[in-house]
Regions:
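Acidic, surface-exposed loops and disordered segments
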Residues: 1-107
Length: 107
């Protein structure tokens, strides 16, 4: 079992998108991460909330995860980049944290 049965790692979200990337590509982690970010930006533009839920790498390295991929007909050397939950927020977003001073430098 990948998760404890008493925990919902996806916070009750109605939709979960799993991003996998082909490990034969030298930039697969960057490519998959960019896919995640672009989906999150597109969702926000449509008024849909999103959250990147980690552990996809570990999930699909497990025997249970490999069995899921096989059942779906996904063959090859893929690595889980992330799980992306999508839905409508239960309430308004809180205020953003203050920016860190001297965190970004202009050169």
């Amino acid at each position: 079992m990948l998760f404890r049965s008493d925990i919902d790692p996806f916070y009750g979200a109605p939709d979960v998108v799993v991003v996998l990337a082909d490990k034969s590509m030298p930039t697969y982690v960057y490519d998959g991460s960019l896919v995640m970010g672009n989906i999150m930006n597109a969702a926000a533009d449509l008024g849909v909330a999103s959250c990147w839920v980690h552990r996809a790498k570990e999930e699909f390295e497990s025997e249970e995860g490999k069995a899921i991929l096989k059942k779906l007909g996904i063959e090859g050397e893929y690595e889980g980049i992330g799980n992306l939950i999508l839905g409508y927020a239960a309430g308004p977003a809180g205020d953003p944290a203050p920016r860190k001073a001297n965190y970004i430098y202009m050169i």
